[in-house]
């Protein structure tokens, strides 16, 4: 590991120790955090300081393919705060109230798999007090997977209106103005057969042309056909026979009486 000293007004304030790597992987079975400790930092730098900060490129136990290390190992070290990189979503460990390990994530989501707010943590260390980590949103564009229930939409125009309403609702909870959406249409609807690839692409372009701050990269049609039992009963085909048999079976169950066993 490498070590550095952070000073304020000429006085030692924090020892910083860390390790990363330049290749695509870290040797299996080697603990990337080994040697990153207050004791080693003091020995290497020849000075003591109130705080010790560790910096690691690790997947912890979240991604076992990238220099994994168990969080309990880091928490057992005499290190006040671990700043970790690799996981692209913000995360605090062991709890948000006592965040001794933090992934800031990446400052900008890169694709639809990196949804939600992205930014950095502003961390405050105070002697005798828990670590304080405040999330600061930095992303200029936020990705969002948006499920839209269109079961009550009688027309394609209504579907478009429902999508726009859902976009604004999602934006109200976002940390920035511009958003990219992956829209998933759900619900049982009579429009199911009409929502083919061409119609979905026309919908996407129409919504994208309406609001410059929102962009839909794709719309997935995951709707289904409504199941009308009464209509099936009147058709006289196999579904009607099946439903009739099911009704008779349920009637038979209702006639069964199970009495309590007689105790001797």
Predicted regions mapped to residue ranges:
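His/Asp/Glu-rich metal-coordinating catalytic cores
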Residues: 1-124, 130
